[in-house]
């Protein structure tokens, strides 16, 4: 009797683990900002970042060993992104290396990834460690955290404007927006 129960428990536990960790449903508030609009804005910002880095000779060239390394690591992860965001399979993924002592990496909406040399040089990351950092940053884009922040910011501004009109005919809208800004701070915990 104990063996079948143990086998059933192992089977159920294995099934749960095989599907990964449930991270919950994304906030529906993000739907207030069209994904395509945010992705186009991110593309423009990313292109500007690349131009600025290139002007400073800080954009890693395509044949740079670290650029090839980063792109190879990303190429192993990108085929699995649609599991978390079906639209991500249409994204035009880009991975670039920025020469800077900053210890940083990010992934913008639409799959625009940048890794700073500072994080690689200072921390001496292995490929697996780079994949962890990159995967974390990709998860922000897949979960559309920037889109959610933009929507919350719009709601805060709208609420401040409405309250400002009700309270003082619009005279206090600016102050109310400032007071509401902590509600929409990036990286806030919900």
Which role fits each region the language model picked out?
Residues 15-190:
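A Zn2+-metalloprotease active-site environment signal
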Residues 4-15:
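Bacterial N-terminal signal peptides
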């Amino acid at each position: 009797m104990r063996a079948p129960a143990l086998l059933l428990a192992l089977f159920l536990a294995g099934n749960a683990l095989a599907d990964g960790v449930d991270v919950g449903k994304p906030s529906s508030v993000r739907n207030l900002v069209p994904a395509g609009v945010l992705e186009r804005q991110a593309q423009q910002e990313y292109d500007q970042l690349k131009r600025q880095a290139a002007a400073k000779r800080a954009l890693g060239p395509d044949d740079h060993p670290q650029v090839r390394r980063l792109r190879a690591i990303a190429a192993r992860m990108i085929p699995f992104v649609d599991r978390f965001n079906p639209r991500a399979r249409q994204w035009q993924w880009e991975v670039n290396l920025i020469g800077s002592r900053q210890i940083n990496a990010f992934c913008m909406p639409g799959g625009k990834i940048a890794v700073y040399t500072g994080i690689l040089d200072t921390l001496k990351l292995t490929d697996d460690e780079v994949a962890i950092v990159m995967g974390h940053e990709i998860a922000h884009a897949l979960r559309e955290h920037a889109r959610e922040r933009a929507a919350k910011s719009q709601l805060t501004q709208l609420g401040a404007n409405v309250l400002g009109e009700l309270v003082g005919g619009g005279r206090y809208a600016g102050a109310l927006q400032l007071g509401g800004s902590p509600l929409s701070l990036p990286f806030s915990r919900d």
